[in-house]
Every structure is written in C-alpha cells, then in structure tokens.
Amino acid sequence: ASQIKEGGSLVLKKGLPVGFDPSAKYKSYTYSITEPADFCVENMELKDGYYQFDLKTPEFRIEKLVLNYPGLLNVENSVAASALALLAGVSHDAIRKALASYSGVKRRFDIHLKNENFILIDDYAHHPEELRATIQSVRDIYRGRTITGIFQPHLFSRTKDFAEGFAKSLDLLDEIVLL
C-alpha cells in the first residue's frame, strides 16, 4: 500500500489480515461475494452453469449482471475487476457487456470434455483456497454427481507449506488420484 499515490485507491478482499494506515492519503475499499463489503454480491443465482447477481457498490447497485463462466472464484474476480473499473470511471453498461462476454483463461475451470457420463475440467488451482473454491463450484454446478479429482502438486515448498490446507480442500472430493 505504500506505493499507492496520493488520491489513489486500494481495493482489497474483505477479511484479509491486513491493517490500514488511518493517515493514508488514499481511499480503501473492500470486496466480497459472501459478506457485506464496499463492493459485494447480492442475489446470486446459479442458472445452467452461469451466475447472475447484483453488484452493490458504495453508491449504487448494478442489477442482474451475468457471468457466463462457471466458478465462484470467477465471480469473486469479476467483483474485484468491476470495482477497479468503476473506480476508474468505466460505465455500468461496459462492465455488464464485459462480464457477459468473458470466456475465461486457459486452465481455469477449462472444460475439455462434457457428455452425459462425465465432465473433464482442467483447473490450475495452486493454492488450497483456489482448490476449495473450484471443487465447491463443481459441486454447485453438478449436484448429485460423483466428483473425482486428479491432483498434481507443484513446487515441493508450496505443497509442504500448504499441506494441511490442500488436505482439507481435497477432502471435499468423492475420489482422488494423486500424481
């Protein structure tokens, strides 16, 4: 935060253990999809694999935004991106169009195969919270289906440092294959 220019803004996920300098010469905002914040999601619905929600801001509400890309992590990222865009002066209509046309990034909830028997999703969740969010999104979208995860740890140090978190997240799966 020390790099933020005077009159600038800091947008931070609500709940992060970060203190703010009350004498700072910038504005601080929070965002969340699960609890009240300066920028937050209300009335979120999952409809045929996409999310529709209202975005509440400090000054107004943008209703019925559509994110045509699955995953709660993507909803959270869209709230953060929308907050930044609004603070930079981007119009509500431009934000609505951008979210509706967003097609994702490679290896984030990337559906490679989908038929009536199974769905193959590739997701580079390299942190326990990202992994948890991805698994929860799969559970929400494909209710009642057996979920098998294939997990390939990357970086010995990351796996060691977050072993307990990875274990808790992977425990949300019905079946697991460790590579």
Task: State where each predicted segment sits.
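Acidic, Mg2+-coordinating active-site environments of NTP-dependent enzymes
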Residues: 1-120, 144
